[in-house]
């Protein structure tokens, strides 16, 4: 099979595209000559695969890191201190939790959240989120069981270089993305399995081509591909979907064509949702090879947060939103020593989930700080 062979795949019958609604620009009425950005909630519903699927909710928050006030300045009843200036933008997933009957109460609970931000270091620079106060509405979510969250500094913080030692910082969530989805989506791609490489395996990767709508003079445009004469810019993100093994049976040819048919028979459908931040979803709607099954749950689904796969691209999605333009399946040797002497086999136009094709952010982009 030639390199970059184009093999058309069946597209979903329903081409109506749903999208994550952008946060509109909503400012408060002037108070003492100042206006403030109002907290906002975006709701997305992902339908279950079958009637018996249990529903849960995912909460992801976007907001700002500010230096904590030290109270060494003058304060009076008539002159109350305002918020400290924004240091940088930040994302913090609250994780999965129970169904919420009154999602509008989430915004009321944001002011009661107290989350401190500190730096640390191991092999890489790290950010620590210390949850010291959490309102009742968030108690059933993953964040309530994990009062100290440690992540790589580039993962959730827009500009970690602005956070200094000797200063206390707090995270102020402002925008909330609430996703109703089946429990079958509560699975991230298994990172340990993704690192396994062997000569008796073939790796299947997904190349997701994302389109960003931004101006030519935008700073992020320098890190993206200009789409010829068309509007917008494009980014290529690779996701490791699974490995499949080569067989040792005699009198049978196990070439690129054989493994290509395996890929086509799997019929992967790709989507883009907001769960752990912008997240790529994969659903195997066809035949699952036995050796690929450990990479998915029992319903053939897996999720790949962009903050894990490509943190820089994830941050662009905070600022400008994005949509899936095309998905290609890549067949590659698993063992690194075999890659230099082989071609990548490309299967173009993997079907995209029409219900989860877009990821849009705020019209006003506070996350560019």
Swiss-Prot record:
GO cellular component, one term: viral envelope
InterPro entries, A to Z: Matrix_C (IPR042539), Matrix_N (IPR042540), Matrix_Paramyxo_C (IPR055413), Matrix_Paramyxo_N (IPR000982)
Gene Ontology molecular function: any one: structural constituent of virion
Key word Thylakoid present: no
Family affiliation: Belongs to the morbillivirus/respirovirus/rubulavirus M protein family.
Lineage: Viruses, Riboviria, Orthornavirae, Negarnaviricota, Haploviricotina
Pfam families per the UniProt record, alphabetical: Matrix_Paramyxo_C, Matrix_Paramyxo_N
Keywords of the record: Viral envelope protein, Viral matrix protein, Virion
One annotated GO biological process: virion assembly
Protein name: Matrix protein
Job description of the protein: The M protein has a crucial role in virus assembly and interacts with the RNP complex as well as with the viral membrane.
Localization annotation: Virion
Keyword Transport: no
Top-level taxon of origin: Viruses
